[in-house]
Amino acid sequence: MNFYSLLPSRHDVSADNITEKFCQFCLCCNPWYAGADTRQLANAFNMIPKSEGQKFEIWVLFLLVRQYHQKIINSWSKLVGFLGVERKDEQSTQKIQQYVVRLKRWMSQTHVDAFFDYLLNKPNPYYLEIPETQPQVRCNVNVTDDLVIKSLRAGLMSHPDVNSSSISTMRTSTSPSNWIHSASASLDDNTHNLGSFVTNPHADSQECPTPQSLLMRASHHMSERGSQQAHQTTPQNHSLPHPPNMFEPPDEDHQLPSAANNSHNHDHAFQTAEAVGVADSIDPDWHQWPDDLRDVSSPKESDGLNDSWSRQTNQVETENVENEAGVPRKRGRPPGARNKIKRLRSEPSVSLTLSISWYERFEKLMHAQNTMLRSAFSHVARLPMETVSQLLSHYTETISQYLPPSETSPIPKTPNFKFISSTLLALVSSHSEILEASTDRLIWTVHQGPLTATICHAFNLEKAPSMHSLAEAQMIPDVPISHSNSMEPLDTVSSLKLEIAKLNAALKEKNLELENLKRKIMNAVFD
């Protein structure tokens, strides 16, 4: 089962279900908080920063952001103006810009910007690169400032009982594929629970929205196991599938890893999720949370509870570290040493990500993806591999002949040729389909993980042959396309477009001669 199928659908977004989809999106991107109550998360999502006490709707903000990405609105100042933020004559001229800064900070802390990118089919590392463990900083947002994490932690602490039959089903799962499959089996039965809490967050109900509709329901099991084992002595690691890259060869079956290779990682993931339920859900900055997120009657009561739990937790944590290290407890140990041990114990393990330059990756995958490109052509067009190889070889050679020389590079044609070649190679890094192939244009649709793109190669009929025989690839969101799996017209594309370009060049020369002749006649008449 594909991991991206657990993300909410972006095609039926409306004002009634956008909050529900946001909660589902956050739970899917933060699987460590499986079983959390999403009522406070829904409240945080709908709490757009106010301006002079004026409240704004999240659906209106989404529509304006979509128009901003579509270049209908060309600045954030105009966007907040359409949202309803106004500056009076006696107010500062920086009021609009100050609210823009507040709005962007709130969107970053709640990851609403990543959610909007997902709905608008734009890549974002928040949902494309889910880390193995919860990092201290994610998408430039510290965990102490992350409103999504705070809401989910508070939801874990106030979660009611969960059905025991679902827990037994989850514990018997031995592989990530079974883990997600068991969760998706109850997707239809539990989706209405999430929607009911979003639409009516104050309703008295025994059921609450849980990520069993996304991943699994395990809050009750976390609380039971967390009270017995507040901290594990050995840090556990768990793995989640990483999304495919546009320039990396994809898996042939586009499936999650096999159970034999990942059953041990799944056990670690389940144990780590259990430990998050109690001890790790206690935040030292609990008293700094907003009142609507803490949901407590008195700040003093919250502070006292937090202090007592923090002292207990820190004492147990320090003793466990000392016992593991075999260090005898000495009187008069400096407080700095204890703080250092606790700091090292609490620091999360961040996996190293090696960044490879684009050109190095291009050179390494050139041969492999060329083979994949020919295979994709052969499969879609139902042509033999020999015919496809000859066709593409002639096609790319014709392109390289008519590319303009590069002024910055000492080797002409090479950067431009790599640019167009990489565009062609990226088309087969995942499922691709030929939508239209004619003498005018070649249109593809590419499905890359949760993203979908339509790419059009239009043959340029206006410029001379010495400039471009093929225009650059254009991303087209919505175009009327006639579906066709036939590639027979491509056999004559190179010759036809060259003849048409020559005719256009000759026509331009005739028009230029005609204009010069008219100019001479007019000069002779007036002289």
Swiss-Prot record:
Residues 328-343 have a biased composition (Basic residues). Residues 284-303 have a biased composition (Basic and acidic residues). Residues 225-239 have a biased composition (Polar residues). Residues 164-177 have a biased composition (Low complexity). Coiled coil: none annotated. The keyword DNA-binding applies. The keyword DNA-binding applies. Changing G332A: Loss of DNA-binding. The modification Phosphoserine is found at S297, S298, S302. Keywords: DNA-binding, Nucleus, Phosphoprotein. One of its GO terms (molecular function) is DNA replication origin binding. Pfam families: Abp2. Residues 160-184, 219-265, 282-344 are annotated as: Disordered. It is found in: Nucleus. Changing R331A: 40-fold decrease in DNA-binding. It comes from the Eukaryota. Binds, preferentially, to the Maundrell ARS consensus sequence within ARS3002. This is ARS-binding protein 2. It comes from Schizosaccharomyces pombe (strain 972 / ATCC 24843). The lineage of its organism: Eukaryota, Fungi, Dikarya, Ascomycota, Taphrinomycotina.
